Amino acid sequence: MQHWLLVRGLGDKPLPARGFTLDRHSSTRRPTVQKGDLAVCYASVWQAVFAVVEIVSDPEEDPQRTRWRWSFKIRPLVALDDLDYAIPSEEVGVFPSSLWRHSYIRLSPEQFELARAAIVTRAAK
């Protein structure tokens, strides 16, 4: 099992503070994620982490799309429902400059656990 950080939202189309969905993640290239992997979700414009999800399908290609043609299903394990309360990414050792032009990056088990614990703690409040 691998651990990932999934970048959600775009600079010109950020996630809303509330009312976002966590059912699928898209990528421009074939992702290396696999069913059963775990991930932390990062809100790009907010520069914060807000959810822990399980990847529940293998990547699927939609040849009808010209951009973001690869996607996979995700299932939230714990999520903050308001991004105003999300954890700044620097607090969990994820720096926005390392995410430039990526839709996902691999996390070390230690990075994942630090982010997971912070999200679980914040969700319990």
Q: Can you name each region flagged by the protein language model?
A:
Residues 1-3, 35-39, 48-50:
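Short, surface-exposed beta-edge/turn micro-motifs
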Residues 1-5, 22-27, 62-125:
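Contiguous surface segments at macromolecular interaction interfaces
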Residues 5-21:
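Short, basic/aromatic beta-hairpin or loop at an interaction surface
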Residues 10, 43-46:
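Short glycine-rich, polar/acidic loop-and-turn segments at beta strand-coil junctions
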Residues 12, 59, 80:
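Short loop/turn segments at secondary-structure transitions that flank enzyme active sites
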Residues 18, 35, 58-62:
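Non-catalytic accessory segments flanking enzymatic or RNA/DNA-binding domains
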Residues 29-43:
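Short coil-to-beta transition motif at edge beta-strands of beta-rich domains
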Residues 48-59:
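Short beta-strand-centered aromatic/proline hotspots
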